[in-house]
Amino acid sequence: LGDVYKRQMNKRDGNIVAFLMELEYMDVEKPSGYSPEETGSKYTQAGQDSAGLTAAVEDPESVKRPNIIVIMDEAFSDLAVRGDFTTNEDYMPFIHRLQQGAENTRTGYLNVSVLGGNTANTEFEFLTGNTIGFLPQGSVAYQQYVQKETPSLASYLKELDYHTVAIHPYYASGWDRDRVYPLLGFDEFLSQDDFTNPKRIRNYISDESSFAKIIE
């Protein structure tokens, strides 16, 4: 929604005024208590912890590797999270069964930092554990900050001999995903060009076809 407001401000006040009003948000304030030394120490410790976990897998061939699937679904919503919402029949029985404690299931809520767009920033935060809260307003981490190999869940799983695949049912070049995903450790990237006669809703590939591609 922030981008919408910016466009409205440009239209209402003109480009020069809008640009000057945005200048104050282009600088990032140093967090309270921050020091390069403390950050470096925590980074080193995190690396040691990760190395220990990886080293614990002495015989990779003997380790079971369950499929790990993460779905970020812009088209999905449960209106019940907004408050009291009742219907005469369950509108998402499968999802609700999972939430109620289905076998081998853990559920919860994940708050994200974007609304109405900039999905690449949600991906960036989830995959890397970094926050865009420390970046200038309007930043898109994929386009501006991922310029070299960057540690992520994908790269960590590669260390455990997983084959890592990213699927996005739209243009491969969107938010520079085709350039960024390999830097995050993905072995393979499937975009809309890799779908054969998918079902579409308002010109977009449907969730049904997207999930079928995952299963495939």
Where are these regions (language model features)?
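Soluble catalytic regions of membrane-associated enzymes that act on cell-envelope
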Residues: 3-216
